[in-house]
Regions:
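Extracellular and organelle-lumenal recognition/adhesion modules and their flexible linkers in secreted
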Residues: 95-547
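Extended alpha-helical stalk/coiled-coil segments
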Residues: 1-109, 113-116, 123
């Protein structure tokens, strides 16, 4: 029994250990179960969060889809609207182009029958004029004949300002092309001697003119500086003089004298142009024109102030101020002289070192300044520019139309009674055409075309066209098939009036810009782009204008 009891005890111990092990295992399992439960709870929470996020994302996606759908719809609408607008714009453009193109068939001019650019040569594009021109091949100058070369004559040299603003000298029979076209002037004489030799100008002894030379634009100048002994004085000082005893004779038909020069000086100083007369024994002061540098204001004084016209124009490139004054003589005045003078500031005195730069002094017989004439020890004369083409193959009968660019170099006082654009030489009155400026007080500076009646030598002028204050313009005229005529200036036309002109049968010349070598009807200005048509042009085709 003891052994059985021992065995039972041993078995009981074994079972106890097994029970203990099982209990431990149960604890471990319980712990694992608890951990698993916690993980499951965490997973469940994560799953719930993920589910919520998924629902939110789905909602957002749905919203975005609706937004995209709306945007797509709007885009479609915008595209449709854009297509509609583009179509409307295209239709409008087509309509505008159609409307704009329609008038041009009346604006574009046909090829002129006579076309002379007068820009840089005497060559004609169309028309007829047998003459000669010079061409340079290597070092050789050759004279070549041609049938489209305008005839040009001038019996003297002449000066001009080329298209680069440089003072230049043209040879005998050489045309002068400036910025505005072909320069056409009548005969003029410069009464200032040694006009292009500054060191020998007849200035007062109180002026120092030793600083002289030629500037970069070719102008011979002197810096006319007051000497120290004049500091504090208020009197004017002569820079160049033509005494009235050696001056211009105004006892005949010519009643105008013009003095001109180019000047520069510090602001406030003044240049005075003075006129005097001489009756054979006594010199008498007539009047002054004062130019104030800086403001370019001109003041006139003296008993003849109301007979003086003066202007000043500054070249912004060269800096030179072109200053001119014209006086009209009255009955009883025989000889008139002129002086170019320095004057101190208005109401002031000469200060140390005051100066005026002076160039191109000129004193001439006429109502406007003309191109500079170089003189030596005596007055010198520039001959008239004579410009012609034949009427043959250029003008025959009506209709006849003309357009030309014109620039006149004169203002309030004309160079003569009827400055010409063109006329005919030596034809019967009924064949004559005169295209010119009017210089009467009522229609001063306006254009007219003059033709004659068949039965008499009475001329009939057109109604005048143009503004008196406009110097540069495109002028023209029409002579229609129905026997009417009119004048045009910068596109503004007069009313038509009757003319008996039917054509020119006489073989003669068209005189352009002047009538005779005496210069009594010369333009004193520029012509460019002269055109003639043997047909009628529309109003739109005649509407050219420049400023």
């Amino acid at each position: 029994n003891a052994k059985s009891s021992q065995t039972a005890a041993k078995t009981s111990e074994t079972n106890a250990k097994a029970s203990e092990t099982a209990a431990k295992n149960s604890q471990v399992a319980a712990a694992q179960s608890e951990s698993a439960a916690a993980g499951s709870a965490s997973a469940a929470a994560a799953s719930a969060t993920a589910s919520a996020n998924s629902q939110k994302a789905a909602k957002t996606s749905e919203t975005n889809a609706k937004t995209s759908e709306t945007a797509a719809a709007n885009s479609a609408k915008a595209s449709a609207a854009s297509q509609t607008a583009a179509k409307a714009s295209e239709d409008a453009a087509r309509e505008y182009a159609s409307q704009a193109a329609e008038p041009y068939k009346y604006v574009l001019q046909p090829l002129p029958d006579v076309w002379i650019p007068f820009n840089d040569s005497l060559d004609m594009i169309t028309g007829f004029s047998p003459s000669y021109k010079k061409i340079v091949i290597g070092d050789d100058e050759i004279t070549m004949p041609g049938d489209k070369v305008v005839k040009f004559k001038r019996a003297s040299t002449a000066t001009y300002i080329n298209k680069s603003g440089v003072f230049s000298v043209a040879k005998i029979d050489e045309p002068r092309f400036e910025k505005e076209g072909l320069l056409i002037e009548g005969q003029r004489t410069n009464y200032f001697v040694k006009s292009n030799t500054p060191a020998e100008w007849t200035s007062t002894s109180n002026i120092d003119k030793t600083n002289n030379g030629v500037d970069e634009f070719g102008f011979s100048y002197a810096k006319m500086r007051t000497k120290d002994n004049m500091t504090g004085q208020s009197s004017a000082l002569s820079l160049h003089t033509c005494s009235a005893s050696r001056g211009i004779d105004v006892s005949g038909d010519n009643k105008y004298c013009t003095v001109s020069c180019r000047v520069k000086a510090p602001d406030g100083l003044r240049c005075r142009l003075r006129f005097e007369k001489y009756d054979g024994s006594v010199y008498t002061f007539l009047g002054d024109a004062y130019l104030t540098f800086g403001t370019l204001i001109i003041e006139k004084t003296g008993g003849a102030a109301n007979r003086i016209a003066a202007t000043a124009t500054k070249d912004p490139v060269t800096g030179w101020i072109f200053y001119e004054a014209t006086i009209e003589a009255v009955e009883g005045e025989a000889l008139i002289g002129a002086m170019i003078q320095y004057a101190p500031k208005k109401g002031g005195i000469t200060e140390a070192g005051d100066y005026i730069y002076l160039a191109t002094p000129q004193f001439e017989n006429g109502g406007c300044a003309s191109s500079f004439v170089i003189t030596t020890t005596a007055p010198a004369t520039r001959s008239s520019d004579m410009v012609t083409i034949p009427t043959e193959n250029n003008i025959y009968n009506r209709p006849l139309t003309c357009l030309v660019e014109v620039n006149r170099n004169w203002g309030d006082i004309p160079p003569n009674v009827a400055p010409r654009i063109f006329d005919f030489s030596g034809v019967p009155p009924i064949e004559s055409i005169t295209y010119a400026f009017n210089t009467t007080e009522k229609c001063y500076g306006q254009l007219y075309i003059q033709t004659y009646k068949a039965s008499t030598s009475t001329y009939v002028s057109s109604v005048f066209a143009g503004r008196t204050d406009v110097r540069k313009f495109i002028g023209g005229f029409n002579i229609y098939s129905d026997g009417t005529k009119r004048v045009v200036s910068n596109g503004e036309a007069t009313k038509t009036m009757k003319t008996e002109w039917t054509g020119v049968k006489t073989r003669t010349f068209i005189r352009i810009g002047g009538q005779a070598t005496s210069g009594t009807r010369h333009l004193f200005g520029h012509l460019r782009n002269l055109r003639l048509w043997h047909k009628e042009l529309t109003d739109a085709q005649m509407g050219e204008s420049i400023k």
